[in-house]
């Protein structure tokens, strides 16, 4: 299994579309649903192969936009089959031979995938960052990520210092839209929109993404980044790639997927 996977190509070559598809697959396997995505659900026929508890599963479905549920997808013509995984037959994983239908598939709402009956528990399997960023919402998402992944306050301090040595601390206030910003020149309370103009765009994007990198390495979920150079300086990109390649750091075998225009990153 590769711990870093790069997608490189000229503009309009399909890099973002591929990462969108990857995010789609991870969302189905992690949440059993598709919701609030930036891409259209209509006209998609999807076939997924995944491994779980000694078996290879083949899942196929048609996807469409829900007529009743806002920003959700519906699943139809779903089929789920399985076969025992043998290392000696690794080259035949994607062969249709030996697959048998999964038994005891119940009825679920149309917006829920039947892979639920195999995986059963929702969990973060991957986090996707598109090339646009989250704007003023970035800071709230960052603090929620710190809480969700149980990362210590010292993590934020180190990440802040990594991107801007003038920032001593950043604290989210109870309304989740105002922040106490401590700089080397003093403290002040600012809104998320004001903070967006105070900090550089690279710092804003980098804060949330780097916190997620740390969580990914800690828990082993994968990270998908579209146009990684839009988030980080080239040197920092190289450092992140090395973190995922270093087995002493990436002990849970997380994988970094990214698209880039940096040809030299492939050296």
Which residues does each predicted region cover?
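Switch/communication elements of ASCE P-loop NTPase nucleotide-binding domains
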Residues: 1-33, 187-267
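Conserved P-loop NTP-binding catalytic core
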Residues: 2-6, 19-67
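Short, glycine/acidic-rich beta->alpha junctions
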Residues: 40-42, 152, 205, 236
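A structural signal for short, well-ordered beta-strand segments and their strand-loop junctions
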Residues: 47-49, 59-60, 128, 168-173, ...
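Short acidic, glycine-rich loop/turn motifs
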Residues: 48-54, 79-84, 183-189
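Electropositive, glycine-dotted interaction segments
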Residues: 63-176
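Alpha/beta-hydrolase fold catalytic core
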Residues: 165-194
């Amino acid at each position: 299994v590769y711990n870093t996977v790069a997608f490189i190509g000229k503009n309009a070559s399909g890099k973002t579309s591929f990462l969108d598809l990857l995010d789609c697959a991870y969302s189905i396997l992690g949440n059993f649903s598709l919701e609030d995505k930036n891409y259209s659900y209509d006209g998609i026929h999807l076939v997924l192969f995944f491994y779980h508890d000694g078996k290879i599963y083949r899942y196929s479905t048609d996807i469409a936009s829900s007529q009743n549920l806002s920003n959700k997808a519906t699943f139809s013509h779903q089929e789920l089959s399985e076969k025992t995984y043998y290392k000696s037959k690794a080259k035949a994983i994607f062969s249709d031979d030996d697959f048998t239908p999964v038994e005891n598939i119940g009825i679920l709402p149309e917006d829920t995938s039947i892979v639920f009956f195999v995986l059963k528990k929702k969990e973060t399997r991957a986090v996707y960052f598109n090339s646009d960023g989250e704007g003023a919402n970035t800071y709230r998402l960052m603090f929620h990520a710190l809480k969700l992944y149980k990362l210590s306050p010292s993590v934020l301090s180190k990440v802040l210092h990594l991107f801007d040595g003038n920032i001593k601390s950043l604290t989210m206030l109870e309304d989740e839209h105002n922040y106490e910003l401590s700089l080397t020149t003093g403290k002040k309370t600012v809104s998320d929109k004001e903070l967006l103009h105070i900090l550089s765009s690279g710092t804003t994007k980098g804060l949330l993404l780097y916190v997620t990198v740390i969580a990914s390495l800690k828990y082993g979920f994968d990270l998908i980044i579209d146009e990684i150079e839009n988030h980080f300086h080239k040197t920092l990109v190289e450092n992140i790639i090395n973190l995922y390649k270093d087995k002493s750091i990436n002990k849970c075998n997380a994988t970094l997927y990214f698209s880039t225009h940096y040809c030299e990153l492939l050296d």
